[in-house]
Every structure is written in structure tokens, then in C-alpha cells.
């Protein structure tokens, strides 16, 4: 039996978000729908989820002592990481002290860096992956590239949104690629992964829910990447029944091995009927924002339902849908959005995240569309995103 208290009352059920960006904001909103008290934590003030939380705190989440202090102050029933850059050893300590880390502290630690999850997938679970080597010095990096061959990709073991990644075609790129990887790591300079290039027809995110009533799958989400970050996503991605079956089997193995209840974003390469594991996030995925319009339960609603111990039951997908990011480039601490009236309409929505500032290129919103076909939905979403004029 799941007992939920009322926010701001003595018996409140309290959820603490570690990371308060646009994904955390939607998780906070879903918690609010169930009367759950929300505490938003991030490294900067006025982060998106803080706008819809009951309280907020600004800390360095890589500082284990600071993390413990805010947890002891707020006494959350659930600690919900939204990002990778967290003091995961402290999360493990807190979990050992009977706090509930979502989906579990082990999953958060393993997926915080690419080495942990790659070794789990390839070596423990024996799943198909790209060829790979790890290196923690420039000389070992050069040896790894020679071993893997060209072309290959280098990534910091700890980074997100494409930071620090380089597609390497020749030896002339090696010095700069190493330097860029050292600059792009979330927790500073360090270890990298060198991966062989996988031949694939398309990439998918298989949003997979581990809940009290078993493992559930959303329809596969296709997406287009540029500079290591997603630009458009769509659902459903068409694929053969055999490929879908293989994708679901890989995702099931990964989420059950990681453990805990919640939604996982399992990233996979698909080539005809073959499926290759890429990465997994133990939390809602940015490409999954399409589910805000494509499903009866968004990825955020599914995540909250699962970690609260509620059954999922089933997931209804409404048909062809797409998302397209609103990604301006400017410098401002007073952003405004013009021409919004031309970005909304029948089966057409936008979300503006409320980020407090921009300095360069930053994702500030997303357009969402449905249509008779995925191709039409993508075009509608892209057109709507382009209508929003970001000023500062």
C-alpha cells in the first residue's frame, strides 16, 4: 500500500530533486499533481524546477558534505537525481542509512560515468556494444585510438550534452581531441572512452519503466543529434518487429541489472534487425520530451508513478508526434519570447523552461506537435520552434 501525505503538512511526502533543469521541472509538476512536497536543488539560483517547487537550495552537488547537509535539513522521503554530476558516493552512504535514492544509488553511480555502465553492459550482461577502450593519459589515449582505428569517437567518461566529444578521422585531430575532452568533462579533466564507429540506420531512446507491476516500454523514440545534443525527437520510430523485440530485451536486462523503480532512457543503435546498446540514463531523457504530447502518461508522470511505488498499468501512445528544441544564441539575463502566438495551435504546443539567463547557445524551450505522419509532425514542430523569437 502506498501512503501519500499532503504537501506542507506534518505528514507530507517529500521529494528532493538533485538537478532542477527542464526535466526536473516536469518531474516537480507531476509530483505537485499528487500533492507531494517538492524541494529543488541545483548549482544555480532560479533554475526551472525551482519555479514550481515548495522550497529550493543552491549547492555544489559534487560536494558530498553540502549534499548531506541539505538532505539532513529537508529530510526527503525520495532523493531524485536529474543530472550525472552528483556526489554519488554520498548517495550510496545516504541509501545505506535507509534513504530512498531514485531509482537506486548504484544505478546513479554506475551511470554517472560511461565506464561503469559500459562495463556492466558489455562485460557483465554481454550485450552488443561498439568496440571501446578507456584511457587516462594522452599517451594511452593515442594507443587506444591506434587500437580502435579510424574513424572513432572520444568522449569524457563524465560529460553530458555532447560536451568534450570529438569525431576523429585522422591523427592530425588527436592533440586537439584530447585537449577538448579534458575541458568537457563534468567533474573536470580525466579519463576518456574511445569508441569505434557503429554503422546504424537510426538511433532510438527506448523509455523503459521499472515499476511495482513490472517492466513497461514506451513506443521507441527516434531523434536527430547535432553537436552531441538533440534537435528533434519523434514517436513512434518505425522499426522491424524483431528489432523492437531485441531492443526491449536489451532494455529489460539493463534496467533490471541497475535496479530500483523509475523510468530509464535506454539509448540504442539500430541497423536493420540488429540492435546495439549505447548508453542509459536512470531518469527521464531529453529526447523523451515528445511524450508530453504523444502519450497519456508522459515520461515524467511515469517516473513519478514508478518511484512512488504506484502501478503503471499501461501506456497509451496517441500516434505520430514530434518535439523540436528552441535553441537561440545570445547573451542575456532578461530573456523574452516574441511571436509565441504563431507557435501554438491545434495539436501544437510549446514549453518555455524559464531558465534565468543565456550566454551563447542554450536550450530554452521545446515545440511539440502531432500530425498524420511522423514526417509531418517533425515539420510542424520545427516550424513552430522557428516561430519563437528569443530576445534579450
From Swiss-Prot:
Keywords: ATP-binding, Ligase, Magnesium, Metal-binding, Nucleotide-binding, Purine biosynthesis
GO cellular component: cytosol
GO BP of this protein: 'de novo' IMP biosynthetic process
Pfam families, per the entry: ATP-grasp, PurT_C, RS_preATP-grasp-like
EC main group: ligase
Binding-site positions, N(1)-(5-phospho-beta-D-ribosyl)glycinamide: 22-23, 82, 286, 355, 362-363
Record carries keyword Iron: no
Alphabetized NCBIfam families for the sequence: PRK09288.1, purT
Its job: Involved in the de novo purine biosynthesis. Catalyzes the transfer of formate to 5-phospho-ribosyl-glycinamide (GAR), producing 5-phospho-ribosyl-N-formylglycinamide (FGAR). Formate is provided by PurU via hydrolysis of 10-formyl-tetrahydrofolate.
Name of the protein this chain belongs to: Formate-dependent phosphoribosylglycinamide formyltransferase
Species whose genome carries this gene: Shigella boydii serotype 4 (strain Sb227)
Name of the gene this protein is made from: purT
